[in-house]
Regions:
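Structural preference for solvent-exposed beta-strand-turn elements
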Residues: 1-166
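Short, cationic motifs built from Arg/Lys/His that form the positively charged side of catalytic pockets
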Residues: 150, 173-174
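Conserved small/polar residues in nucleotide/adenosyl-binding loops
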Residues: 167-172
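Cationic, low-complexity basic patches in intrinsically disordered or flexible, solvent-exposed regions
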Residues: 177
Length: 177
């Protein structure tokens, strides 16, 4: 429950399609705007994913998925590598999707991906309906996450030829000016 109905609907897509339980309660400054609420939920969810995966021993690590939603086709590719990098190649034709500014969706994913310390590329190949475009992004992300976090019983160690997944730069939240 974030206080933003369309955003709650999108978060439900992550829970449903990644097969992860999400319980989110955010009491943000919605009287000002939705930006901080959406960004903070992304930061908190990304941090929770990173902590839940620990050293990532045994996970599949790499994943991709394509999702169709009527006329829309979206793909997501991710690597749970501890090196945050985000590409958002998604175009909508309206300033708002649901009750949200369209730019908030990339802000959400950027925050989540930074704190989860993953590399993630989300791209809509085509589509006309703005609701379908955004929802297919959330579903495609969720399916990729489900695959990437799946434990592979053949992998006994950390999924890296180096034997570790290190990232030594601090999170942008940890930066002190």
């Amino acid at each position: 429950n974030t206080g933003i109905a369309f955003f709650d609907h999108m978060l439900q897509q992550i829970s449903t399609h990644a097969l992860v339980d999400l319980e989110i309660k955010c009491d943000g400054d919605l009287k000002v705007d939705m930006h901080h609420t959406v960004e903070d939920v992304g930061l908190a969810l990304g941090d929770s994913i990173n902590k839940a995966l620990g050293d990532k021993k045994g996970i599949t690590r790499f994943a991709n998925s394509y999702v169709t939603f009527d006329e829309t086709l979206t793909r997501t590719a991710m690597d749970l590598c501890n090196r945050p990098y985000f590409i958002w190649n998604v175009k909508t034709t309206l300033d708002k999707v649901g009750d949200m500014d369209q730019e908030l969706f990339s802000e959400f994913f950027k925050s989540l991906i930074t704190e989860a310390r993953m590399n993630c590329h989300i791209e809509t190949l085509y589509g006309d309906n703005n609701h379908h475009i955004i929802e297919s992004c959330f579903k495609s992300f969720a399916l990729s996450l489900k695959k990437a976090i799946t434990i592979d019983p053949r992998k006994k160690n950390i999924p890296s030829s180096k034997g570790c997944l290190l990232y030594t730069s601090p999170s942008p939240r940890d930066h002190q000016p």
